[in-house]
Amino acid sequence: MSEAEARPTNFIRQIIDDDLASGKHTSVHTRFPPEPNGYLHIGHAKSIYLNFGIAQDYQGQCNLRFDDTNPVKEDMEYVDSIKHDVQWLGFNWSGDIHYSSDYFDKLHDYALELIDKGLAYVDQLSPDQIRDYRGTLTRPGKNSPYRDRSVEENRALFASMRQGEFAEGSACLRAKIDMASPFMVMRDPVLYRIKFADHHQTGSKWCIYPMYDFTHCISDALEGITHSLCTLEFQDNRRLYDWVLDNITINVHPRQYEFSRLNLEYAIMSKRKLNLLVTEKIVEGWDDPRMPTISGLRRRGYTAASIREFCRRIGVTKQDNNVEMAALEACIREDLNDRAPRAMAVIDPVRVVIESLPMGYEQDIAMPNHPNRPEMGTRQVAFSREIYIDRADFREEANKQYKRLVLGKEVRLRNAFVIKAEHVEKDPQGQITTIFCRHDPDTLSKDPADGRKVKGVIHWVSANRSLAAEFRLYDRLFSEANPAAAEDFLSTLNPDSLVIRQGFVEAGVPAANTGEPFQFEREGYFCADSRYFSPTHPVFNRTVGLRDTWAQRAAM
């Protein structure tokens, strides 16, 4: 089954099906309109998957349009990163990239049309006064004293705004709708404000910039969008969307439909809060692998396929709900279980000397790159008299449930020999530094000849032919499921969201490309870090563990 065939139906697809069946539309045209003031996150991925996926499935078009109406917060850095993220996720936009700034001249003309119709006026209340005059949900607003200016005066003042004759915040253009409306968005919303800032597309041509609600609907209409898909927080804004299009001379009137935004547990989606994490250096940047940004997830080792599958599974509804982080982790775990080659790495190493092997002993052992995919081939892994195992895989004493190496007992080394721990060596602090063992020479990749059962299997690397590596063990950035609900979201940070360990990895792995995934056996899924990895200093990021340990912790 293809990815498109696997997509579940939803209320938006039902609307589209009905529109096509009735002849209301003969084709489908959607758009993804991010503001270039930050990096895309997993919530945007849901919108990308919905808008581009619908266009693909209905053989329609999807525009990438940058809602670039606030030059103070926007930057080409974000434009470039958004384009990269969309394409990395597996989608391509129709035709050229669009910018809301492409339509600044037309938007200005439509603003003049509203002024000429007596439906817009220049207001000189201060921003604080405008907020006060707007009222509250329980108290109606009151009219601005500037509301009833003549068309001629409003035209002249609007021209003065454009010519830079007003200071920022001293004047704005507002729609004349209804200050007593039960919907706050309809209480004479601001259409244009003054900002003396160069724009990344238009330079210094403009010092007045249109607001989102005025720009968005007109841009949709100019591009021939048939289905304008927004998240639920824009539900009330639909009234303004329709009001603007109903009151200007334009031939196309798209319809806006709202769906629930993605609320992912143990994460935040607020750009302001994410920016605070970056500026306060709580994380090392927007691509920190603990961030919910697409660039952060990519650097951590998430694949585009796993993110698309996550978006498919959570579906599209009109009800806000919280999605468990485990659902996202399950998607990458399943994807990497199928595609990631296996390798061995020891993250918390302790030295093992197999005394029954001769000094200088080495042997190459053939190991499958994937237990269920023989077409992925095999690799040669060096085995030697001295190896490293994980410190957690040895105890001097243990109960019967412990199936690893115990003093005086046996364990199997993965794809190698059965060994038995004889004695240990410790440092002055009592820390074990070396475990001395003997091996059964007849057990190389096979069971003991006498029929005895050796239940435990542990991984290892050669001490002589492995390479020192850094392992970054990433976990959830927050320790509470809903950090945004906390009075101070920073108080919910998980102190163990990053643990750095120094260990060893089998010799062939450091030749990996950055971002290339591996399953380090018994440890989890890792990838070569795109920022710090080099063949002489390999750095690996843990993408996800082999199982959901958070669920286990919650059950305790």
From Swiss-Prot:
Molecular functions (GO terms): ATP binding; glutamine-tRNA ligase activity
Catalytic activity: tRNA(Gln) + L-glutamine + ATP = L-glutaminyl-tRNA(Gln) + AMP + diphosphate
GO cellular component: cytosol
Keyword Aminoacyl-tRNA synthetase applies: yes
Residues at which ATP binds: 35-37, 41-47, 231, 261-262, 269-271
Residue window of motif 'HIGH' region: 34-44
The keyword Nucleotide-binding is annotated on this UniProt entry: yes
The enzyme's E.C. designation: 6.1.1.18
Ranges in a coiled coil: none
Annotated S-S bridges: none
Sequence motif: 'KMSKS' region, positions: 268-272
Domain of life the protein comes from: Bacteria
The entry's keywords: Aminoacyl-tRNA synthetase, ATP-binding, Cytoplasm, Ligase, Nucleotide-binding, Protein biosynthesis
Binding positions (L-glutamine): D67, Y212
Pfam families the record matches: tRNA-synt_1c, tRNA-synt_1c_C, tRNA-synt_1c_C2
HAMAP family reported in the protein's UniProt record: Gln_tRNA_synth
Family membership noted in the UniProt record: Belongs to the class-I aminoacyl-tRNA synthetase family.
Assembly description: Monomer.
NCBIfam families associated with the record: glnS, PRK14703.1
The name this protein goes by in its record: Glutamine--tRNA ligase
